[in-house]
């Protein structure tokens, strides 16, 4: 299905006033797979709940029905910026003295309104200096990141938020025994928020905006949206906002925006996990019941969009590989029936396996790449196609091929069985998604934002099963007209519209790690019923056996649903045989004597099963996944392909050309270039050369080389993992019946990449023409794995480098605004022969490079010490370990990871016991021993002409590398 399939349920209830045990009446839906309960408070706040007791935790989302489409036209990006500011605290936390702080915050608010009216550059600089000075004084009272500390104390993970066109959503994953504290914190956060730390957080938004200007796919989509939605904010406004508006923010507008939309009758609390609904509702009533509703919410009104009668083409430029994007305007989520048919239409065209375009364009190697989606938002949807050219192919040729496939939707040139197969795959997808608390709760979010009755979402499958081919073709003819689309060519070139937002000078604010609000102290001292940790017992939680030939068989029963995963692991990868990656790509285009390549895709899709064959550096993994009843038939298809694939020299020739073009395209991608630089830094040029084929070697490969490598590998000794609903005996028999094992398979010798040791400082510079630099700082002193180091590593990483409460985030982003993204950690080896390695990363603007690197080096070597921050990190670790549960396939994977290190028991148990007795002095001693005064390889990816090369040379001898050096081709 083209967009995430979601289910949601609602429960409205009245609190019974009599009796000490409150009872609630919920809105439910018969046949709802989530057994959802929905309750509505008197103030309009909705609570969506689904119980899942697999782990003692809850995924929580607080969804506000407001997004960038609701931003004032003169201050776009406001909803997104407000999302950032909602992490800054309230009158009760985030400050040591709100009464003393408030006059300065009021003054800052007024000064920003004055700042917005200034146009003279010198006047603006002078006024911003005043704002900065007052902000610094206010920071002496504020307590940055106290919200994050609160979440750490209660053991929350995944603390974050996001803003889109239609929604702003705040997320936390909390222990089941912390519901009361979570509700207390969130209620105060939403009812009594305070805007503080405004100008430093604005710096983070500047960074986010500047980075977004280099995202070529976003440029193309914005170009298309401007045509499809010429009257609606979907096409007029962007989520982050315009550069001009970000330069002239208004705190007053933000507060007015919050007062209008952040009200209980515009909010839903959506949860999934281990909890009692009655008790949960009682807690929500207790803390959120006082929240005043807004009966007059000002919602968006807009004129209907004009009909598009002829194609509109636009061109955008950027550094990434070329592509073409095509979009049609379609019905939004509020038009449930039409939107759902659009989902089926999207999957008939493209499903990643057997859709029309999958087979006609991708499998047939007519274009370099393709994907499509029916992107449905509440007000409107859009049907999007994206195509990448092959070498020598024009974007216009790609356009014509894609439009031809859409034409087949209109004429009905496809088998109706494809619709039936699509429904079966949607069912499987839903079943898999509902294993996750996050997906379950997000289903509620989407239903609420779209204004649906939960019954319509809960029973969606019943309607989808009735969709006919006629409905599909009618929908395509109505909404995917031959001339009613917008198109964006994304070409390689300098973007004339990029105007980097210059960062104003700011004074680093005080971090005040020694301070703590009374509110935080009360949460820290609150008593909750302890949850005892449960560590996996591999003698009870799984089973081990042997198949023929001594092949190890690992078994875990799926107690949740009927999905089965079969996995075969071979200890050989691209480090041993760099042909394997291309070999498996080649195999995916081939058929067998009894099935064509296209028929294989169709048969697997019809079975609602999927497979993957992939080679990593040290292992090759074969996976088959689907319903238990079909898994054997799917395994037969894959095994037949592995051993009986029919070579095709035409396919191989095209594949080689595509591989070379993909390599050229990789050198255009900032992310791919940085990934290659990191591999070079971590492992060195010898590893790159050994595990990478040259272009000449690729061109010389034959079918016999590639298919022979696969066949040979599959005759070697390996491991088989099974996770499914069958009992062990039946599962073992199924594998033996459908998986071919050679007689006396030869064991494989494990060969793993070893991180290179650093014997002196060195700087590596790799060119990439962008306004942002990516930076890696790496050190390896050759220390080998010792499980007794685990508690120290865990404590140090949590205190210093991971999360928004850690030193790195506070110093690099919160206090100084030097980086949008920064992290650091000491990484543990994955196998005994490898080493511990220290890793640090920064992504920021080129003009901040020197300040960012200097500050990073300072905090790494002179780690700030705070007893209060340490206690928060310690509480977070213990709470997370108490509620962590290793389940499902994770049991088998953890067993293998531990075995690779020579261990047989969970490492978490020792960490849990040791951390309870650790002190800040232990962390300091660990930092002195393991981190301080290391020697590093510094890797920079960026535009060297923007860098302070004199400063960079002080880090160590400078070596200029080419992209060919780091990629190995």
Go through each PLM region and give its residues:
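M16 family metallopeptidases and their MPP-like homologs
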Residues: 50, 55-68, 77-79, 95-188, ...
């Amino acid at each position: 299905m083209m967009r995430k399939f979601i289910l949601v349920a609602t429960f409205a209830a009245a609190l019974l006033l009599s009796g000490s045990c409150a009872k609630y009446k919920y809105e439910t839906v018969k046949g709802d797979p989530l057994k959802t309960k929905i309750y509505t408070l008197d103030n309009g706040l909705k609570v969506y709940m689904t119980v899942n007791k697999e782990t003692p935790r809850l995924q929580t989302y607080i969804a506000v029905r407001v997004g960038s489409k609701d931003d004032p036209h003169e201050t776009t990006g406001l909803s997104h910026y407000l999302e950032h500011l909602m992490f800054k605290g309230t009158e009760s936390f985030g400050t040591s003295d709100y009464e003393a702080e408030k006059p300065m915050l009021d003054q800052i608010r007024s000064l920003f309104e004055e700042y917005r009216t200034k146009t003279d550059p010198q006047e603006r600089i002078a006024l911003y200096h005043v704002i900065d000075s007052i902000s610094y004084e206010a920071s002496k009272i504020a307590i940055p990141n106290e919200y994050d500390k609160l979440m750490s104390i209660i053991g929350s993970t995944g603390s974050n938020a996001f803003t889109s066109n239609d929604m702003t959503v705040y997320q936390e994953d909390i222990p089941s025994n912390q519901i009361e504290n979570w509700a207390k914190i969130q209620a105060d956060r939403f009812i009594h928020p305070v805007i503080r730390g405004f100008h430093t957080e604005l710096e983070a938004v500047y960074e986010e905006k500047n980075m977004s200007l280099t995202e070529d796919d976003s440029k193309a989509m914005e170009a298309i949206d401007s045509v499809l939605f010429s009257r609606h904010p979907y096409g007029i406004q962007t989520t982050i906002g315009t550069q001009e508006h970000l330069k002239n923010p208004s705190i007053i507008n933000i507060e007015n925006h919050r007062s209008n939309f952040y009200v209980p009758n515009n909010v839903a609390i959506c949860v999934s996990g281990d909890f009692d609904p009655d008790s949960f509702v009682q807690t929500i009533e207790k803390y959120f019941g006082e929240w005043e509703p807004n009966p007059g919410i000002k919602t968006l009104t807009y004129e209907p969009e004009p009909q598009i009668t002829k194609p509109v083409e636009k061109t955008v430029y950027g550094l990434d590989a070329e592509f073409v994007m095509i979009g049609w305007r379609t019905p939004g989520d509020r038009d449930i029936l039409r939107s759902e048919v659009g989902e089926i239409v999207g999957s008939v065209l493209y499903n990643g396996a057997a859709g029309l375009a999958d087979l006609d364009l991708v499998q047939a190697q007519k274009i370099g790449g393709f994907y499509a989606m029916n992107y449905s938002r509440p007000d409107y949807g859009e049907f999007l196609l994206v195509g990448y050219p092959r070498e020598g192919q024009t974007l216009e040729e790609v356009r014509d091929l894609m439009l031809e496939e859409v034409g087949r939707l209109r004429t009905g040139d496809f088998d109706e069985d494809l619709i039936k197969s699509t429904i079966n795959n949607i069912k499987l997808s839903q079943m898999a998604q509902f294993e996750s608390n996050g997906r379950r709760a997000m289903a509620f979010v989407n239903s609420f934002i779209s204004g649906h009755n939960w019954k319509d979402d809960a029973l969606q499958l019943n309607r989808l099963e009735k969709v006919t081919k006629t409905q599909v073709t009618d929908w395509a003819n109505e909404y995917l007209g031959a001339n009613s689309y917008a198109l964006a060519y994304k070409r390689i070139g300098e973007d004339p519209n990029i105007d980097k937002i210059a960062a104003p000078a700011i004074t680093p604010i005080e971090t005040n790690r020694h301070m703590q609000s009374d509110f935080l102290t009360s949460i820290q001292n609150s008593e909750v019923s302890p949850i005892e940790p449960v560590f996996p017992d591999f003698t009870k939680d799984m089973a081990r056996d042997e198949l023929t030939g001594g092949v190890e068989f690992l078994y875990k029963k799926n107690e949740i649903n009927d999905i089965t995963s079969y996995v075969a692991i071979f200890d050989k990868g691209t480090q041993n045989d760099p042909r394997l990656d291309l070999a498996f790509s080649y195999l995916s285009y081939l058929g067998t004597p009894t099935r064509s390549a296209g028929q294989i895709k169709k048969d697997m899709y019809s079975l609602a099963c999927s497979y993957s064959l992939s080679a990593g550096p040290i292992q090759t993994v074969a996976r088959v996944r689907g319903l238990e009843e079909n898994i054997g038939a799917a395994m037969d298809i894959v095994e037949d392909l592995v051993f009986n694939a029919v070579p095709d020299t035409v396919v191989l020739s095209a594949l080689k050309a595509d591989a070379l073009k993909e390599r050229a395209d990789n050198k255009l991608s900032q992310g791919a270039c940085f990934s290659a630089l990191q591999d070079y830094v971590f492992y060195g040029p010898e590893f790159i050369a050994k595990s990478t084929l040259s272009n000449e070697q690729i061109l010389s490969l034959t079918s016999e080389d590639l298919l022979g490598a696969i066949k040979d590998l599959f005759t070697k000794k390996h491991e088989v993992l099974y996770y499914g609903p069958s009992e062990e005996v039946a599962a073992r028999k199924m594998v033996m019946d459908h998986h071919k094992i050679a007689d006396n398979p030869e064991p494989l010798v494990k060969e793993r990449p070893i991180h290179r040791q650093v014997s002196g400082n060195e700087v590596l510079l790799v060119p990439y023409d962008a306004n942002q630099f990516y930076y890696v700082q790496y050190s390896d002193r050759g220390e080998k794995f010792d499980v007794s180091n685990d508690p120290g590593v865990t404590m140090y990483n949590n205190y210093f480098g991971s999360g928004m409460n850690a030193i790195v985030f506070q110093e690099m982003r919160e206090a100084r605004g030097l980086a949008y993204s920064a992290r650091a950690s000491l990484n543990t080896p994955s196998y005994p022969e490898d080493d511990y390695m220290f890793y640090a990363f920064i992504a920021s603007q080129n003009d901040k490079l020197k300040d960012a690197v200097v500050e990073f080096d300072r905090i790494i070597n002179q780690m700030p010490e705070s007893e209060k921050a340490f206690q928060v990190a310690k509480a977070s670790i213990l709470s997370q370990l108490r509620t962590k549960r290793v389940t499902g396939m994770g049991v088998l994977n953890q067993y293998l990871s531990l075995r690779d290190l020579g261990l047989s028991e969970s490492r978490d148990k020792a960490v849990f016991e040791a951390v309870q007795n650790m002190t800040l002095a232990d962390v300091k001693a660990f930092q002195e021993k393991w981190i301080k005064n290391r020697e590093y390889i510094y890797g920079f990816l960026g535009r060297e002409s923007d860098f302070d090369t004199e400063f960079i040379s002080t880090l160590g001898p400078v070596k200029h590398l080419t992209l060919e050096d780091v990629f190995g081709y």
